Design a protein with these regions (language model features):
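Acidic, Ser/Thr/Pro
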Residues: 2-162
């Protein structure tokens, strides 16, 4: 009787250990792929911006890291611009401009920027690497990223509300 009880105890401990290790493995696998996307041509992914309006100072940013030069269209904002940049992409006006804060003046630019260009209802990005876009608003809204290239696009994207 005692030997049978010990055998059941060992079996139970072994099964518990296997379940815990499997859970850790699958959690790790899930966490590694968090924020990584692959879109086929024409497919889209939506990202919700939830500003922390209850804070005195708040801002939101879209961190977009691309490993290739495939074209992705970003839509959902009226004006797009990178953090720490002075170039603004006005979607509604269909104008690019450089803001000069010291002179309180805007210089209009041609729509032929190398990595980002203006389209009808958004911007198309084709750079390789990481860029951070300022996406702060005073209410929640959705940003849509669409693959407008003819091949699958692999990227990492994350909206951070601070």
């Amino acid at each position: 009787m005692n030997l049978k009880r010990k055998s059941n105890w060992n079996l139970g401990c072994s099964l518990t250990l296997v379940v815990v290790l499997a859970a850790i493995f699958f959690f790790n696998l899930w966490a590694q792929n968090l924020g990584k996307y692959t879109l086929q041509p024409g497919e889209s992914a939506n990202f919700t911006v939830n500003p922390r309006t209850h804070d005195v100072e708040y801002y939101s940013e879209l961190i977009l890291k691309k490993n290739d030069t495939n074209k992705l269209k970003l839509s959902g904002k009226k004006v797009w611009f990178e953090m720490n940049s002075d170039i603004f992409y006005g979607v509604e006006e269909q104008k690019l401009f450089r803001r000069n804060l010291s002179e309180n003046d805007d210089e209009e630019l041609p729509n032929n920027q190398k990595d980002i260009h203006l389209v009808k209802n958004g911007i198309v990005v084709s750079y390789q690497g990481e860029k951070v876009f300022y996406v702060t608003n005073n209410k929640s809204y959705t940003i849509t990223i669409t693959n407008v290239d003819d091949k699958p696009a692999h990227f990492e994207a994350q909206v951070v509300d601070r």
